[in-house]
């Protein structure tokens, strides 16, 4: 019996060894950073690990995406970036992610260990060791590579598209992009997610929406050496910050350490005022971008070399076309990728960085291909070009000018830079703002696009590159030099305000806006109102080409009719506004200051113009052209919404526009600031300074004839509904609720006393009174009417940093 058992064990061991020999001998070996074997017969990847406990960077990407902007699973999308290592426990290897958010930078090993053991780590996967020989451990990596590391199922679920799960029978390795290099080992897999589609987005982009097939790329990357020197973060510098908690910090210093994200760049000659770099920063443009797009992307990205020259470098920033042999996801290449979606959407400037230091290893830009078509559409609406067979060249030039700036903007993010949404107030001082085309009227009163978009890097951009990339000589004090750079831009009067202060509808900063122009938002709104009138008065069938359905005019009209929408947001922020900066103690930036009464009243006056029936009405001759959709065409998210079925609805268009103004004015945070500012200083505006001009433009003005009458009534109801909403909204302070209740009571009292000789006006008054009665009986159950949404606005041609 003992002999049988011994023979069985010998046979098993021999078979197991032979099996592993078969894996190595019968599989294709690919040597590189971490050697691996591809078994064609099994369809498996085996990783041959020589160094356990050695950290490396693990990144996943979506190499082939879904194609829906709303879902967000785009080609080239970067997933999680993690420092990981393999550790052994008996017959298993664990892929573990240490916790670099909490560390101890210390020579005391016990102090380091105490922090490591205080906070959780993450084991990403466990592998059984298939074979051990010559100091190498063989593991089967396949299941890991075919797992949902990118969180695709979760994204589909969160976007309302249904519950999807990986189907292993329809998933496999993708060999054309599974490669090995000296410093990175890359794998790619085909993943098929099966489920029942619940949303329209996934149906619109997938041939069989029950099976969504994408490709995921995995990169194991050698960590950079220790020669990179992190640069201190300053909130005024314009850079994104990386941070961690250092528990070995002296008690008198901050626990949190902050550094900027930036590429490694050094001068060959640090003593020279202008020197070539040791290694330039090179970006490569996707060959999939067609001409003239590709040339525009290259030209715009190359603008950054101007800023690097100001920082003391010669040819430090270069842009070329991506070679055929290079994978755009290869960690060794900074890439500007051309990404297609079914609808226009955001572009992204992302990076892969060393989580320990903030050193950017790879910049990766994703540019939405439909952006240029949106700018071309805007130019079409402005110029009405199809009267003759020849197309004005300024249309394409405007679109390409925007694309150059977009390329520069997104590359700026990958250099580590924040948005600067105050730059437009400083004479378009940065490509890191969101630019609205600057549309002018020439001396003949005709549209002039000659200065629609700026060219080149701005002055603010030069300051930021100096801060992030200057290589200071041995006789220079870095802290002093960095302070001097910031003091310089402060002295020159530039402004820096970023996303957290510019994006919220309740934002208070007078200069931090998206898609605006000029130093004074109210004055620019007045100017844009005049431009809009010229555009609408001249709008005709020449907005579409000969042979195109006349019903397509609607989509060209939409961005013209709502041309003012972003400047309305900018002007509204003056109400209850506060001018402030990211000041630190000891600098010359100003302390916060409430916007003057005159500036706030000017904003209210400008905004009130956008509520007049004359402003909101579409010219009669143009209205005659707006036709129901032709067969084979249909309304899209770029179209006006309608309450009249197939026909164009000018009243709903007007109501939608008015809602843009009211929703900004009656923001609960804004109205509370108005109360506080007025209580602090009686010279500041109060609620009456806002409501009286609005009443004069609506309930207290005469009703025009024709459609203007119903437009005015629709606007009046929006005002009424906003007051109701403020009175019960959880976001409203108690003071705002009280003031809103007071205003709506006074309004109802005035309406009750009004007499109307017109049946529709009388019905309008009675309806509002009846609605208020219903509201009083059950305010929190009362359903406040919501207007139909406008056609898509943002992005005109911009991004969202990941």
Segments (PLM) and residue ranges:
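Sec-dependent N-terminal signal peptides
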Residues: 4-13
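Auxiliary tRNA-acceptor-end handling modules of aminoacyl-tRNA synthetases
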Residues: 20-289, 307, 321-374, 379-395, ...
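Zn2+-dependent metallopeptidase catalytic core
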Residues: 54, 291-316
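Soluble non-cytosolic domains of exported or imported proteins
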Residues: 77, 287, 291-299, 397-406, ...
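Sec-exported extracytoplasmic/periplasmic mature domains
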Residues: 302-313, 412-413, 417, 437, ...
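The catalytic-center signature of Zn2+-dependent metalloproteases
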Residues: 321-340, 401-457
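Conserved catalytic/binding loops enriched for acidic/polar residues
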Residues: 426-802
């Amino acid at each position: 019996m003992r002999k049988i058992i011994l023979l069985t064990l010998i046979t098993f061991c021999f078979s197991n060894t032979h099996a592993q020999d078969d894996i190595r001998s019968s599989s294709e070996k690919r040597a590189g950073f971490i050697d691996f074997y591809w078994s064609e017969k099994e369809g498996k990847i085996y990783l041959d690990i020589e160094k356990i406990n050695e950290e490396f960077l693990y990144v996943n990407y979506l190499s082939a995406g879904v194609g829906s902007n709303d879902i967000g699973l785009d080609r080239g999308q970067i997933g999680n970036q993690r420092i990981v290592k393999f550790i052994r426990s008996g017959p298993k290897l664990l892929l573990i992610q240490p916790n670099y958010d909490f560390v101890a930078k210390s020579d005391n090993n016990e102090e380091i260990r105490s922090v490591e053991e205080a906070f959780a780590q993450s084991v990403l996967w466990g592998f059984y060791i298939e074979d051990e020989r010559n100091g190498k451990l063989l593991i089967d990596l396949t299941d890991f590579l075919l797992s949902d590391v990118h969180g695709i199922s979760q994204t589909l679920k969160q976007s309302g598209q249904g519950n999807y799960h990986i189907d292993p029978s329809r998933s496999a390795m993708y060999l054309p992009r599974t490669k090995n290099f000296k410093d990175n080992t890359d794998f790619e897999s085909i993943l098929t997610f099966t489920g029942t589609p619940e949303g329209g987005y996934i149906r619109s982009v997938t041939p069989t929406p029950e099976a969504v097939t994408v490709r995921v790329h995995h990169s194991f990357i050698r960590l950079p050496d220790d020669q990179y020197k992190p640069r201190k973060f300053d909130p005024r510098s314009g850079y994104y910050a990386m941070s961690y908690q250092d528990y070995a910090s002296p008690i008198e210093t901050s626990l949190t350490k902050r550094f900027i994200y930036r590429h490694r760049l050094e001068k060959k000659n640090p003593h020279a005022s202008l020197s070539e770099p040791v290694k330039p920063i090179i970006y490569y443009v996707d060959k999939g971008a067609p001409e003239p797009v590709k040339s525009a992307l290259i030209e715009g990205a190359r603008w950054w070399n101007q800023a690097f020259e100001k920082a003391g470098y010669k040819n430090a920033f270069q842009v070329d076309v991506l070679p055929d042999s290079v994978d755009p996801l290869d960690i060794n290449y900074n890439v500007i990728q051309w990404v297609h979606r079914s609808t226009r959407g955001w572009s992204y400037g992302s990076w892969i960085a060393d989580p320990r230091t903030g050193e950017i290893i790879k910049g990766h830009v994703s540019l939405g291909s439909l952006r240029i078509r949106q700018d071309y559409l805007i130019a079409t609406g402005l110029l009405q070009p199809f009267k003759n067979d020849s197309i004005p060249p300024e249309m394409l030039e405007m679109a390409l000018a925007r694309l150059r700036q977009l390329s520069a903007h997104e590359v700026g993010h990958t250099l580590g830079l924040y948005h600067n949404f105050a730059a437009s107030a400083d004479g378009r001082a940065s490509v890191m703002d969101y630019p609205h085309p600057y549309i002018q009227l020439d001396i003949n009163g005709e549209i002039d696009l000659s200065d629609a978009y700026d060219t080149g890097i701005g002055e603010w951009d030069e300051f930021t590159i100096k801060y992030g990339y200057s290589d200071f000589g041995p006789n220079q004090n870095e802290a002093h030099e960095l302070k001097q750079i910031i003091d310089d831009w402060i002295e020159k009067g530039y402004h820096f305000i970023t996303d957290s202060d510019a994006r919220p509808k309740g934002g208070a900063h007078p200069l931090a806006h998206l898609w605006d122009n000029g130093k004074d938002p109210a004055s620019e709104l007045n100017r844009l109102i005049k431009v809009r009138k010229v555009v609408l008065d001249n709008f005709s069938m020449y907005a579409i080409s000969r042979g195109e359905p006349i019903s397509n005019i609607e989509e060209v009209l939409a961005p013209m009719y709502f041309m003012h929408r972003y400047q309305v947001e900018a002007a509204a922020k003056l109400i209850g506004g506060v001018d402030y900066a990211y000041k630190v103690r000891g600098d010359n930036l100003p302390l916060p200051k409430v916007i003057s009464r005159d500036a706030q009243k000017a904003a209210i006056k400008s905004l009130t113009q956008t509520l007049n029936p004359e402003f909101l009405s579409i010219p009669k001759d143009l209205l005659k052209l707006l036709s129901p959709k032709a067969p084979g065409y249909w309304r899209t998210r770029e179209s006006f919404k309608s309450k009249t079925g197939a026909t164009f609805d000018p009243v709903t268009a007007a109501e939608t526009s008015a809602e843009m103004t009211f929703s900004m004015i009656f923001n609960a945070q804004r109205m509370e600031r108005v109360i506080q500012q007025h209580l602090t200083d009686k010279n500041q505006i109060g609620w009456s300074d806002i409501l009286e001009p609005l009443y004069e433009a609506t309930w207290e003005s005469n009703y025009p004839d024709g459609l203007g009458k119903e437009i005015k009534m629709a606007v009046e109801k929006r005002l009424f509904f906003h007051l109701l909403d403020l009175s019960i909204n959880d976001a409203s302070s108690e003071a705002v609720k009280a003031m809103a209740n007071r205003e709506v009571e006074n309004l109802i009292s005035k309406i009750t006393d009004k007499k109307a000789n017109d049946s529709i006006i009388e019905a309008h008054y009675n309806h509002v009174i009846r609605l208020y009665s219903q509201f009083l009986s059950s305010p929190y159950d009362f359903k406040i009417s919501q207007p139909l949404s406008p056609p898509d606005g943002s992005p005109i041609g911009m991004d969202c940093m990941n």
